[in-house]
């Protein structure tokens, strides 16, 4: 499971 972190 890959979580994309968007700032």
Curated annotation (Swiss-Prot):
GO cellular component: extracellular region
Key word Secreted present: yes
Subcellular locations according to the entry: Secreted
Keywords noted in UniProt: Pyrrolidone carboxylic acid, Secreted
Domain of life, source organism: Eukaryota
Residues bearing PTM Pyrrolidone carboxylic acid: 1
Tissue expression from the record: Expressed by the venom gland.
Major place of residence: secreted
Family according to the record: Belongs to the tachykinin family.
Record's protein name: Tachykinin-like peptide-I
